[in-house]
Amino acid sequence: MIQADRLLGPKLIGSFTAIVAVFTAYQLALNFHAYRFAWACWDYMLISANCSFIAAMVLVLSLTRRFDASLRQLRLNNALVMSDDDVAVLKDRTRQRAHTIELLSGLLIGTLVLGSFIFVFGEFIATIWTTLRMNQLPSGGWALAEFGLFVVISVLSAGIAGLFFGRLTRYGMLASVLSDDHERLRVIPGHFDGACGLKPIGDFYLFQAILLAIPILWLGAWWAWIIPQYKGLVCPVTQQPQMLFAEWRGPFFVQWLVVLGYFFMGFVRPFFKLRQRIRATRLSLVRDEAPRLEQEILAGHGREAVLGPAHAARSEDDRERLSRRLWSINTMGDWPMDSATLAKYRSLLLGEVLLPLGAHLLPRIGNLL
């Protein structure tokens, strides 16, 4: 447990992100020195991958703070009835359950990326290994050292990303714990946040979805569009095609599917788990409370004629209160997010999955037509 928390500490993550940034700057300088403005020769795969990792790390450093803030706002919304000690116990219990998931996730993603390098550079690695077994040094020592550094940074970056994927899964598991606790998690019809009081946790899971959009869209763009579209791209300086693009397509597709699994665990599953709780509460209120409210409102109209002015005014106030409660029940939404936010990000959430698939399938559909 402590080990995983230390690995994901802001100092260590910030230091490693700085190393990746320096390496990326070096690659940019190297590409510019070698190719200048011959853009077709640049190593976009490496540069864009590192830039995506840096962007994700900048965002992910606020993950724990956002999670704590979402729980605090739930309590301020009166949607989560917990003391400070209860919240601490909940966090500790969730951390203990998900500790192994985080470590295994880091190992899985790191191994997956390492396996991808072995798959793509298998013959090259075998040649180097054969040369070393013959007690000889392979040629191109500096280039090999640079390649080795690139592989190490890539695998470590993948492992760190995997640890965070596990943490997203851990926070996603919290939705199941909370949604099953009907006494502590309250669904409040007509709440001012527009999401039955659950907007803070819904917004947090949306943030997790945005984080996962970075690797999903990057991997999807490369396997579904960039590699098929530009696999024959020739560098005008060397007169050689861009190397190894086609070989990366299979590994990128597998990685894309794996990250989609984390998207499901870190956003889709908890989001729908909370939606299930909201819908169950609404059905219960519509079945049990709404008919009683209707009867009381209509009965109040009959009593008003025989009441004095003071009692009539009080009866009017009571009917107004009952009407607001009935309206809030009948107009309850389904999602732990207000409608404006949901509409704003719906295209992004669908695009994470549909854009790569569309880019992959459209050329095939065009050929059939």
Predicted segments with their positions:
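Conserved structured core elements
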Residues: 68, 283, 352-356
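Loop-to-transmembrane boundary segments
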Residues: 2-20, 85-119, 146-149, 188-220, ...
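Juxtamembrane inter-helical linkers in multi-pass membrane proteins
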Residues: 73-91, 172-200, 279-307
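Membrane-proximal, solvent-exposed terminal domains/tails of membrane-associated proteins
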Residues: 219-350, 364
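Juxtamembrane boundary at the C-terminal end of a transmembrane helix
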Residues: 359-369
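Transmembrane-helix bundle segments that line or gate the permeation/cavity pathway
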Residues: 1-185, 206
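Generic multipass alpha-helical transmembrane bundles of integral membrane proteins
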Residues: 120-274
